[in-house]
């Protein structure tokens, strides 16, 4: 009988008794939005999903399609057009339209678990609107409401808030950000995180670091001095860590001073862990790890998203000594710490009834 995950003190023994494949599956994500469960060690899966303005329906369907238990090659699900079409229609209409289509019927049934009565989920105020209130209490209240909605849907980690700085007026995701002033962003982000995590789920502040434009976001480099980095671009993350006690942080696609954030030990380990004293889980933006997964793990990444990932090269790197198993153990430890903290919080915070179930968004007050 192997060790059981029961609290933070149990983690070292659990890690020591996990197999190499289990560790790699843990850091490589089990399916699009789930980590790998290990039932005989009482390690549950956790559900990670967008977003800070409400439940992401595409993620719900994609996660279902990438379940290894129902797909020969889960990675083919990312090319499934049905999941996009499904989120654009009323589920009652979809059930009638796709009657007789086994795949679509399955998807409709799965989506219905998250969309009561076939209705769309609530769309909460975007970041730029929350920032414009200049009111941390409002930010905390909205954060708590979003957290309740996501927790009711079974989500454990929300990919948000976006604590980047709105620097480019043409930035395609400025609406997610709280504004261009670093102190406004810092105070708003910390409040939103506190509110969300008070509902019993983990917030995931993103995108670390200096991710401020959509144009060429996978190849561009944000070149900046250390002072500008700390006083402007890192300020929101610093506040989310110190004042919000955020449990998770997501890396970015872009490079900083010529080094891509997902492969940067300077950013993920030296800055985020060292100078900003973050002790939670670091996750990659979707696809940011690319093919060099051992490189991103060595730099400080804990969870490579989205899953399922082929970890064969990482396994070979460990076996050949190019990636230390101690490094891998450290990454797994951070994920298990996140799982324990979430589940402990959920035991002490009553499960909510969602706003969608209550139809609260149809009231004059909302």
Where in the sequence are the language-model features?
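Glycoside hydrolase catalytic-domain context in secreted enzymes
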Residues: 1-359
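A short, hydrophobic C-terminal helix/tail in secreted or cell-surface proteins
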Residues: 360-366
């Amino acid at each position: 009988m192997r060790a059981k995950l029961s609290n933070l003190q149990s983690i070292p023994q659990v890690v020591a008794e996990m197999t190499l494949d289990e560790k790699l599956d843990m850091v490589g994500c089990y399916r699009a939005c789930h980590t790998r469960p290990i039932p005989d060690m009482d390690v549950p899966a956790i559900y990670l999903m967008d977003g800070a303005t409400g439940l992401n329906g595409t993620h719900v369907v994609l996660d279902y399609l990438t379940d290894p238990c129902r797909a020969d090659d889960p990675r083919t699900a990312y090319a499934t057009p049905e999941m996009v079409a499904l989120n654009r229609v009323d589920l009652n209409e979809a059930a009638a339209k796709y009657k007789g289509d086994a795949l679509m019927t399955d998807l409709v049934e799965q989506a219905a678990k998250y969309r009561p009565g076939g209705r769309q989920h609530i769309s909460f105020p975007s970041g730029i609107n929350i920032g414009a209130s200049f009111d941390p209490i409002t930010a905390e209240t909205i954060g708590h409401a979003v957290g309740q909605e996501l927790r009711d849907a079974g989500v454990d980690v929300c990919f948000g808030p976006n604590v980047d700085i709105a620097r480019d007026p043409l930035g395609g995701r400025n609406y997610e950000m709280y504004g261009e002033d670093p102190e406004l962003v810092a105070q708003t982000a910390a409040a939103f995180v506190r509110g969300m995590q008070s509902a019993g789920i983990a917030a995931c502040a993103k995108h670390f670091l200096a991710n401020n434009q959509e144009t060429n976001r996978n190849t561009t480099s944000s070149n900046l001095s250390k002072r500008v980095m700390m006083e402007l671009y890192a300020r929101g993350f610093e506040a989310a860590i110190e004042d919000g006690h955020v449990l998770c942080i997501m890396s970015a696609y872009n490079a900083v001073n010529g080094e891509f954030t997902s492969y940067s030990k300077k950013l993920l380990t030296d800055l985020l862990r060292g100078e900003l004293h973050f002790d939670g889980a670091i996750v990659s933006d979707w696809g940011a790890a690319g093919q060099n997964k051992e490189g991103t793990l060595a730099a400080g990444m804990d969870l490579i998203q989205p899953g399922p990932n082929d970890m064969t090269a990482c396994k070979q790197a460990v076996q050949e000594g190019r990636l230390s198993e101690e490094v891998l153990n450290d990454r797994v430890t951070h994920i298990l710490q996140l799982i324990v903290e979430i589940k402990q919080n959920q035991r002490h915070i009553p499960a909510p009834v969602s706003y969608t179930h209550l139809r609260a968004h149809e009231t004059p007050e909302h």
